[in-house]
């Protein structure tokens, strides 16, 4: 995924001066307007850098050496990159790109306290998305540590609060809905990487063999065949969790996200990470992966 670093920022500055030189050579060019646009781009980059610095300071309150904390730190920056990649492929304006990055940076801020208190990612221990929104936008207004401008408070709050909802509902504002969908896609996209790179013990508390020994619950398989995400409460065995990680990709909003997933061959790689003890389980995993890839290709082809 595309990462923007100090060299990219230097390039923006360089381009700014090239543009200035160009418009100065032609009196008919609106050089003031172009310079304002370039300055705005630099301001947006600085805004994200300031938010990132504040986030790093916030992380100092937690044990970075803890495997689950480390996972979520890496995941956070993975979601930032994923949000930017999706947004740029969609052709969104720079303000929306930077806004998507900030939401990605803060989307899981509630996870760190959940891990500190419960050493768990389970939704039954804490609704981390709701908690994160309350933490940022409650009486103390922690959001001001990260974002000085309050124009997007409602949008950011809603996107964070709803990013882990089973179904995205109840948003009427068009731009807020865009970013709520975008963070959900970016979150799922980086979770593909997480499921391949993190140790299975950190993810599910057992090794790959232990995951593959289970039987897929009937309700879980029904959801998979209905092309729906799996309810957390329906999962019984570790293999239920694993198959649910693939089924959740039916709930992707933008074809650009599917394009990235196909480029990385994520679905097959996630399926193949686990050795399934029962032929029936292997067969069902193969069926789901094939159906998922067919669905993804159709969405990409139809661009919707």
Identify the role of each PLM range:
Residues 4, 14-17, 24:
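Low-complexity, intrinsically disordered or signal/transmembrane-proximal segments
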Residues 19-37:
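Short, Lys/Arg-enriched N-terminal segments with co-localized hydrophobic residues
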Residues 39-46, 68-73, 77, 81, ...:
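Divalent metal-dependent phosphate-bond-processing catalytic cores, especially two-metal-ion Mg2+/Mn2+ enzymes
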Residues 52-78, 110-122:
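Active-site flanking loop/helix segments enriched in acidic
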Residues 78-86, 127-140:
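An active-site-proximal "capping" alpha-helix that borders the catalytic cofactor pocket
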Residues 91-102, 142-161, 175-182:
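Acidic/histidine metal-binding catalytic segments
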